[in-house]
């Protein structure tokens, strides 16, 4: 695999690999031995939510204000234009194959959205500073925010419950009840109370 300029490298439950490059906005699928299975050329930058289920890959573009759904052949199967329903959506967390959480920056709200029926399930006032926001997720009525140099936990009412400095952070993932924070060379784990480092390789790069 050509990992130069790779923004993200992801793997699904069937051993396939997905490479997203910000430089040319390409999203490419490979099998386990590196054979290319498909490629999608995008017009805007997108954040890949998850590829665990390769039949339905969810991706979000802040620039385009839309959510795309991609099938196993890297074909677009659905697109939702968020600007026709909401204000400016800063970030999206796809909770599963039906629901997503979204932060509406212009209206200062946290929204739970059913993207299958395109209906709003619930919304909460969520007035926090979104400067340098890199990723977020929602689990058990807690909102986990990853910034350039900080990891924060909020209630759905915007109350700050936890904050810790962190460097070179890239993305958040939920593993069972824990929140994992992936950096360029480290992985940290938040167990609901404390943050601990569980992996570090100075000469390696986590994509």
Tell what function each PLM region has.
Residues 1-56, 64:
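Start-of-domain marker
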Residues 28, 66-68, 109-111, 152-153, ...:
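WD40 beta-propeller blade core
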Residues 1-2, 34-41, 76-83, 117-128, ...:
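A short beta-strand motif characteristic of beta-propeller blades
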Residues 21, 30-31, 61, 70-71, ...:
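Structural recognition of the beta-propeller blade-terminating site
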Residues 3-12, 44-51, 86-95, 129-140, ...:
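Repeated scaffold domains used in trafficking and secretory/extracellular systems
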Residues 85-157, 162:
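A charged, solvent-exposed segment within the mature domains of Sec-exported extracytoplasmic proteins
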Residues 11-12, 19-23, 58-63, 102-106, ...:
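Conserved beta-strand positions in repeat-built beta-propeller and related beta-rich domains
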Residues 56-107:
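Hydrophobic alpha-helical segments and helix pairs
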């Amino acid at each position: 695999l050509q990992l130069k300029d790779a923004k993200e490298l992801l793997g699904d439950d069937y051993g396939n690999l997905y490479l997203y490059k910000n430089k040319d906005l390409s999203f490419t699928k490979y099998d386990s031995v590196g054979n290319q299975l498909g490629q999608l050329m995008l017009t805007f930058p997108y954040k890949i939510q998850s590829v665990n289920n390769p039949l339905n890959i969810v991706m979000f573009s802040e620039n385009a204000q839309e959510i795309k759904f991609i099938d196993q052949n890297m074909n677009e199967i659905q697109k939702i234009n968020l600007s026709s329903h909401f204000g400016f959506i800063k970030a999206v967390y796809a909770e599963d194959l039906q629901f997503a959480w979204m932060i509406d920056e212009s209206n200062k709200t946290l929204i739970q959205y059913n993207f299958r029926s395109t209906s709003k399930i619930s919304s909460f006032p969520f007035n926090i500073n979104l400067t340098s926001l890199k990723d977020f997720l929602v689990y058990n009525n807690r909102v986990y925010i990853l910034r350039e140099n900080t990891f924060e936990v909020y209630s759905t009412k915007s109350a700050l419950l936890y904050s810790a400095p962190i460097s070179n952070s890239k993305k958040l993932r939920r593993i069972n009840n824990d929140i994992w924070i992936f950096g360029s060379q480290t992985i940290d784990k938040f167990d609901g109370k404390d943050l601990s480092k569980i992996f570090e390789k100075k000469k390696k790069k986590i994509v």
